[in-house]
């Protein structure tokens, strides 16, 4: 008796789900730690050598965690997951630009991140962000590098 498995393993879908899951954990942790210590988060942002940051910090103190929570919603949704990954990449890119400004300023400023992530130095933050930027792009890169090739002999028809 010959039993054939018709279940198809889709590595791209697994990668998409894994990337989304890691970003959900990141955004959830980041948003709740910022909201839990809102005062410190805003006060540290106000120290940044960025024009108008002193005035915009209270607004960013709400907008950033709300954006992170909205990204969680997109990443949970199968329909909007890819959009959530792209927007996660863009938010991480904007954080990376901010971190680069902090590094280039030469000032020893506290990190505005919350929780355990705030223990990282600015250089470690760049590596951390670059890693999560790669995680957010990995499903798209995988599709480009390894496009599906269908052949008449394929067992996954």
Regions found by a protein language model. Give the residues of each.
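Membrane-interfacial helix-loop segments of redox and metal-homeostasis proteins
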Residues: 1-157
């Amino acid at each position: 008796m010959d039993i054939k498995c018709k279940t198809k393993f889709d590595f791209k879908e697994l990668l998409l789900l894994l990337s989304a899951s890691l970003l959900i954990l990141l955004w959830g942790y980041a948003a709740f730690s910022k909201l839990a210590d809102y005062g410190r988060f805003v006060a540290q942002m106000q120290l940044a050598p960025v024009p108008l940051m002193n005035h915009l910090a209270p607004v960013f103190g709400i907008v950033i965690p709300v954006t992170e929570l909205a990204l969680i919603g997109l990443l949970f949704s199968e329909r909007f997951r890819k959009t959530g990954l792209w927007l996660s990449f863009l938010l991480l890119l904007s954080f990376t630009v901010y971190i680069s400004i902090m590094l280039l300023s030469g000032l020893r400023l506290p990190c505005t991140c919350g929780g355990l992530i705030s223990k990282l130095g600015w250089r470690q933050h760049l590596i951390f962000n670059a890693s999560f930027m790669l995680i957010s792009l990995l499903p798209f890169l995988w599709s480009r590098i390894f496009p599906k090739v269908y052949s008449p002999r394929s067992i996954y028809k």
